Regions:
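SF2 helicase catalytic motif II
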Residues: 128-157
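Conserved helix/coil segment N-terminal to the catalytic DExD/H
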Residues: 90-107, 114-132
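Post-DEXD/H (motif II) to motif III coupling segment of the RecA-like Helicase ATP-binding lobe
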Residues: 147-205
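Conserved helicase motor
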Residues: 61-68
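Loop/turn-to-beta-strand initiation segments
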Residues: 105-108, 134-135, 169-173
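Conserved small/polar residues in nucleotide/adenosyl-binding loops
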Residues: 235-240
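Conserved Walker A/P-loop ATP-binding site and its immediately adjacent core
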Residues: 27-48
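Walker A/P-loop NTP-binding motif
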Residues: 4-21
Length: 240
């Protein structure tokens, strides 16, 4: 459920833009995964979700993303097949090559912190940032960003804020399966603020809660109930 916890607000924002007639090209959300394997795994769920929202464009930009559309399409055909084994085409709203992403940046950009740093250095990728109308930055598995990796990512977040227009309108979302209990709230806020370079509120810490459906406990069954159940099973067996 972590993926849906940040994807649904992003989709909601984009749909509201569409209703208002302001949904133009430009990156609205950057989702940063620590590893390509995680991004590729989540892309399966995103493809299933975004097929219902063809107006929302999305794409993965990492070291495996091909430069040209022709190479990207050939690689897609080698990787993805339908039930009959035939190659499948990407959805019209999935951008699969660097050249198209540079010409027409997606609304939702999926990447990793290393590639994001390279993109900020390359003139070819300037359109991704100069035309961005960024509203969300998501750091998935945020607990990974500690030590040297955390310091590099923290600096990257500050450089990104300096690069985009209206940085104060960006909402940061950090996800982790190892948050800790309420007694760790202070450490969580301190970690998030140091990593992203912005202030966080305690009310912004959201933990998952397990809710089980209320069911009656049948600890003692009267013998008559077992006899009735047995007769039903015998009747069903005879009828078959």
């Amino acid at each position: 459920g972590k993926t849906e916890s940040f994807l649904l607000p992003i989709i909601n924002h984009l749909l509201r833009e569409q209703e208002a007639g302001t949904l133009s090209a430009g990156v609205r959300a950057i989702i940063i995964y620590p590893m390509n394997a995680l991004a590729n795994d989540q892309m399966k769920r995103m493809r299933a979700l975004f097929k219902n929202y063809p107006q929302i464009c999305y794409g993965v930009y990492n070291g495996n993303t091909e430069h040209t559309q022709s190479k990207a399409l050939a690689e897609y055909h080698r990787t993805y097949h339908d039930e009959t084994g035939e190659p499948t085409d990407p959805a019209p709203n999935e951008i699969i090559s660097r050249e198209v992403m540079q010409e027409r940046p997606p609304h939702i950009l999926i990447t990793n912190y290393s590639m994001l740093e390279y993109m900020m250095l390359r003139p070819k990728d300037d359109a991704v940032f100069s035309g961005a109308k960024l509203k969300f930055i998501v750091l998935d598995e945020a607990h990974i960003y500690k030590g040297a990796t955390g310091m590099e990512t923290s600096l990257l977040m500050r450089r990104l804020r300096a690069r985009i227009s209206e940085p104060d309108s960006v909402q940061y979302i950090l996800t982790s399966a190892t948050l800790g209990g309420p007694d760790a709230d202070g450490d969580i806020l301190s970690f998030a603020e140091k990593l992203c370079g912005v202030a966080f509120q305690r009310s912004g810490i959201i933990r998952s809660t397990e809710k089980r459906p209320a069911m009656e406990d049948f600890l003692d069954f009267a013998p008559a109930l077992f006899e009735e159940l047995q007769s039903c099973l015998l009747y069903t067996s005879d009828a078959a």
